[in-house]
Amino acid sequence: MQRYDIIRMIGKGGMGEVYLAYDPVCSRKVALKRIREDLSDNELLKKRFLREAKIAADLVHPGVVPVFTICSDSDPVYYTMPYIEGYTLKSLLKSVWQCDSLPKDLAEQTSVATFLSIFHKICSTVEYVHSRGILHRDLKPDNILLGLFSEVVILDWGAALSKEMEEDFLSDIDVRIPGSLFSNMTIPGKIVGTPDYMAPERLRGTPASESTDIYALGVILYQMLTLSFPYRKKKGQKISLRHQISFPEEIAPHREIPPFLSQVVMRALAADPRERYRSVSALKADIEQHLQGSPEWTPKIVLHTQDRECWKFHEPILLSKYFPMLEVSPALWYSLAISKIESFSEVRLEYTLLRKGLEEGFGILLPPSEGVDHGDFYHGYGFWLHIKENILSVSLVKNGLEIQKTSRHIDGNKEKFFIAFEKQNHRLSLIIDNIVWTIHMDYLPARGGRIGVIIQDVADVCGNIVVLESSGSLQVSCLAVPDAFLNEKLYERAITFYRRIVESFPGRKEGYEAQFRIGIALLEKASENSDSEGFIQALEEFSTLHNSVAAPLEYLGKALVYQRLGEYNEEVKSLLLALKRYCQRPEISRVRDHVVYRLHEALYSNHRISLVFMLLALHVAPESINASEEEHFLQNLHGKIQDTLFCNLDISPVDFRSSKMELLLSYWSGFTPFLLGLFQRSWDLKDYRALADIFYTAADLGNKEFIEEYSGILRENIRTTTFSKEIVEILPDQLLCFLSGLEALTLQESIEKVFDGIENLDPVLILYLFDLFAKDALIHGRGEEILKAIALVEKYISPQQRYRYLLPYEVLSYLWMKDANKVYDLLSSYDESSWIDDSSHAFVLYGYWLALAEDSSLAYLHLSGCREDSVFPRALIGVFCSPLGICEEQLSYQERRQLLLQKFIFFHCLGNSEERDKCRTAYDSKERSL
């Protein structure tokens, strides 16, 4: 274990102890599980401990924690895994057992809908495990970990058994070991598993099977649906009595459990194994059927692919012009055909495509009827399908933006593909060969219903396109008529009909939806006429939904208005209010979907608001961000990560789905509502380093209210908590000293007060205080005080830290004092090649020196040599000096502050005190506007 730095213990079980550790070789935090020292001499238990690790290591699935290393020749034996922040399903269930009322956030976490999503992931994992010939044999909530970002992971493979192994390997061994040591473990010589989750035949000694794992899943599902056990075990109770199980809807009528789900769970809990599901795949399929719905479709229209009576064929289009993000050659031209008929409100399209058509790319679109003939066909929804190297990719496109993508490997010999597109109950689905590939929910009123097809060769469509209508839509929605008027921009007529619906359906879903669409109609009308009064009317209409069942729609509507007006602070505030106040309302899913769309929209336009929506999406819809998008986002954030002090001082990389990423996004966006949640999470984990990062961020953003309120809370927490002697990065006493320094800094107290007790601080905390002090001193014309601070702190940090973090401020201090010779001497500490490298601090510092000692034209010439696509905020002044200048719409809150500080120094060196002072005033008055 010498390779790892142990940070603290995070769990303890029957045979093992789990620690949070740091792996310096791979620069990452890991979970290290080792056998208990008092059991390490028992060869049988050691063999079983290693067997658990090897089974887990052989499984590759998102629902199984991968094993990094297994050390069987060390003493004690151990293995390592990724560290996942989260909690067990048992702890979540336990938090709501026998509770009469629940907080809103906990009620949402334990809703039937949320639990079904979790259970589906559990089934997927067990389905995979069974396909590998392995039985878990101890499935229970205590062995299911729920990550902070929607991960669902099955733990503890100590009882797992391969089908090739004899069950006697564990159950028929007689080992005499003190019973007190094994209160929390499966004991050799006894039936393996947890009795409350065992099938009746298993308790009678029958060997484990897939059916017994299915029974355990049934118990878990019953708990999820009812928040209680399917039976109550009493001493002396016979096994047969256990199966007097009540239906879930009878046990928990307030949970509104659908009868279908009740049938599913009762089948999984059948006393007779022959009456249970034959496989986990069958159980999972029924859960999917409930989650997705299974409508009956009736053929209505057949669109003959080459019949001009059915289609209007347009001139060939260059697809890369309209969909630049799609995988198409920029030189390829495609045929575009728009149907002459409009589809139904709930519609299914069926067609068969040749492989050749998919290799070239095929698009199916639902563009608005307005403007289709004038090049606006790409507005609306659609799917783009493309095969490359036996990988079939499906992209969901909205208004020209790719907002979702799914890719899977396909059979290289397959030549035809049956494809179905469904639009039903706000849900868009794409099915390929009867397998659902993509599902998306859209709740805004549809704008038109014509069908568009984009393909290189129409002959690649085998036969015709069949349009089917849902049996559920045979009764026309009362909203269809005003929706048609809205689609044709007949706003007053649409509003009149919507109001009639509101009056006819008071307190019902149809009435609330009509009220929401009145606001949409007013918004569209105001946007078309640039009518400021119209925007106010739209806001007033959305306000009528306040405190109703459809209350989330009030804030969704207001967010749409503020987005059109460019008032992004108010837009985000509206969305956040909906997400916080109404997290249990059914309509909240519409707000979540809109957040995800706005994230893609902002990223595509490179707008500064993208950081805020990335943060919101991580909180409310993390499952909507796939692995390739994660990688893309991390690439976009590379420069910001490099220029963030708390990231630089932490040698482990920033994971996308982590608390540190949330803090990073808060820091650069200036969006701080989630700091409280991060504070509470870090305190629960006793992660003092993370707490220091949070307070540093709040101080740098000028959030004095947070520091004043939560420094007191943290002090009280530390005072009333008994701390164990675990290994930690930063001690509680050091954190308290750091808080005192922060408070002195916010109160503008003396330098001695700010750095009082510095000799007791960790170097990380010293550098945090110095960075905050130096920025404040610089912008307020106290550059000479930076030198005093350097003299105070340099003896407590390493030479490398002094060079990297203190030297740039030392140069800036002498620039403020206009000591050109000293500045040049200090610049000589950098390699001269770094003077022209815009990723280096020396690049900008050299530009400042040129402005001070040489000529302004030379300074502008040097700084304008910065790459226009530079990703490093430290070089923003270079982009500012370039011929094209800088677009502030693309700068986040923190980037705008850094640019003001850089311009402040630059104009000071140029001797332009008027512009310099303007920068200082703007810096001091800079509100955290998005």
Curated annotation (Swiss-Prot):
This is Serine/threonine-protein kinase PknD. Gene3D superfamilies: Phosphorylase Kinase, domain 1 (3.30.200.20), Tetratricopeptide repeat domain (1.25.40.10), Transferase(Phosphotransferase) domain 1 (1.10.510.10). ATP binds at I10, G11, K12, G13, G14, M15, G16, E17, V18, K33. The keyword Nucleotide-binding applies. Keywords: ATP-binding, Kinase, Nucleotide-binding, Phosphoprotein, Serine/threonine-protein kinase, Transferase. Pfam families: Pkinase. GO terms for molecular function: ATP binding; protein serine kinase activity; protein serine/threonine kinase activity. NCBIfam families: PRK13184.1. It catalyses: L-seryl-[protein] + ATP = O-phospho-L-seryl-[protein] + ADP + H(+); L-threonyl-[protein] + ATP = O-phospho-L-threonyl-[protein] + ADP + H(+). It comes from Chlamydia caviae (strain ATCC VR-813 / DSM 19441 / 03DC25 / GPIC).
